[in-house]
Amino acid sequence: MKLDAPFNLDPNVKVRTRFAPSPTGYLHVGGARTALYSWLYAKHNNGEFVLRIEDTDLERSTPEATAAIIEGMEWLNLPWEHGPYYQTKRFDRYNQVIDEMIEQGLAYRCYCTKEHLEELRHTQEQNKEKPRYDRHCLHDHNHSPDEPHVVRFKNPTEGSVVFDDAVRGRIEISNSELDDLIIRRTDGSPTYNFCVVVDDWDMGITHVVRGEDHINNTPRQINILKAIGAPIPTYAHVSMINGDDGQKLSKRHGAVSVMQYRDDGYLPEALINYLVRLGWGHGDQEIFSREEMINYFELDHVSKSASAFNTEKLQWLNQHYIRELPPEYVAKHLEWHYKDQGIDTSNGPALTEIVTMLAERCKTLKEMARSSRYFFEEFETFDEAAAKKHFKGNAAEALAKVKEKLTALSSWDLHSIHEAIEQTAAELEVGMGKVGMPLRVAVTGSGQSPSMDVTLVGIGRDRVLARIQRAIDFIHAQNA
């Protein structure tokens, strides 16, 4: 049989990996980690990375899921050299190989009815035998190829399949455990396990990195690869990701979709850094640049044990990257969250200034956008607890006095604003907090914000003065 590569197979490329998700749902964190490990291994070895969409499940695959997967890969910045390739567009190729296998006696048509197969399974279960096809049709010459049938791969019956898993070591499966796999359905569509084999062959895949739930597929795929004379890639089956309670990761542990983490305010760098450490390590190092990941990553350092997802650790990493990445870069991601929350940022400080002001205070960009609304739009009410605590005593007098001094400023800058607040406190013979806290609630609506001088510069003179007057009126109304 001949190779039919969908792209030019550069003979100088010694490592070619692939990420091959099924578009039946979003890109979840387990799939994202698999994609990352596969991508890193290719980059570490100056190789190529292929994106393949395994959409043979026609009933469950959707264009929306495909778009979500590609969006997730792009957001994580895991670019591919080849693809995306779609299995549904390669059915002619798969059927060509199947027909050749039938001609060469490597596969055969099976005309058994569903009733016959159920009866066979029932008998085997009663006899406490492993359910498997009995090759009833292997030498059948009484049916026409035009009659309804499936095609089965003629699996070897002797010996074992042995492969050295790059993560788990030597794995051996007896061929007596394997059935004659259906490789083409009655409707003429090829099955998943077969399509994978042909694709890995045609695309020159040298290393298959995937979840441990695929281990049972591997011996079947190896036998087909051997039958058609294709090279056997190196397999690496990575462990599953559990929640922090040891149970399989699910929605009850929080977000499981990659794009949900984007929506929740995480930077892609934080999620990538977290995922790479979720089953792989390099000494005690926790923070990795993209370049360091590529330089250090090896499959034999990937853990065989399941990993536990810890949201607090992810938040810690996210805050690190919010602080350490250039404000211009963080601001681009922050802008999405303002739009998502319906906040118009056209009338207010530059988003880079917001990042600089709030980087130490916020764990997520969603929190940063939500907690900085007052820079761009008016708030409806004062926080009840903050107003009750700080709009009492001589708060109205302090606000009136500081408003007077702020109004008189010739320059609206940090130093001048700080001096105005300081002078107000001195003249009233009170601590800075007796002026600063009522002022904070007056201009932000809450008791939390960056330092007052920074906050007031960001909000702008006209808004600040109007909000102080509003607070004074509010206090008088409350005391009336």
Curated annotation (Swiss-Prot):
Catalytic activity: tRNA(Glu) + L-glutamate + ATP = L-glutamyl-tRNA(Glu) + AMP + diphosphate
Comment on bound cofactor: Binds 1 zinc ion per subunit.
InterPro entries, per database record: aa-tRNA-synth_I_cd-bd, aa-tRNA-synth_I_codon-bd_sub2, aa-tRNA-synth_I_CS, aa_tRNA-synth_I_cd-bd_sf, Glu-tRNA-ligase_bac/mito, Glu/Gln-tRNA-synth, Glu/Gln-tRNA-synth_Ib_cat-dom, GluQ/Sye
Residues noted as binding Zn(2+) in the record, renumbered to the chain: 110, 112, 137, 139
EC number: 6.1.1.17
Enzyme kind, highest EC tier: ligase
Claim: Acyltransferase is one of the keywords in the record: no
GO molecular function per UniProt: ATP binding; glutamate-tRNA ligase activity; tRNA binding; zinc ion binding
Protein residues bound to ATP: 251
UniProt keyword annotations, A-Z: Aminoacyl-tRNA synthetase, ATP-binding, Cytoplasm, Ligase, Metal-binding, Nucleotide-binding, Protein biosynthesis, Zinc
Intervals of motif 'HIGH' region: 21-31
Locus of motif 'KMSKS' region: 248-252
GO cellular component, as recorded: cytosol
Co-factor(s): Zn(2+)
Protein's cellular compartments: Cytoplasm
HAMAP family named in the record: Glu_tRNA_synth_type1
Role: Catalyzes the attachment of glutamate to tRNA(Glu) in a two-step reaction: glutamate is first activated by ATP to form Glu-AMP and then transferred to the acceptor end of tRNA(Glu).
Subunit structure of this chain's protein: Monomer.
Family: Belongs to the class-I aminoacyl-tRNA synthetase family. Glutamate--tRNA ligase type 1 subfamily.
Protein name (Swiss-Prot/TrEMBL): Glutamate--tRNA ligase
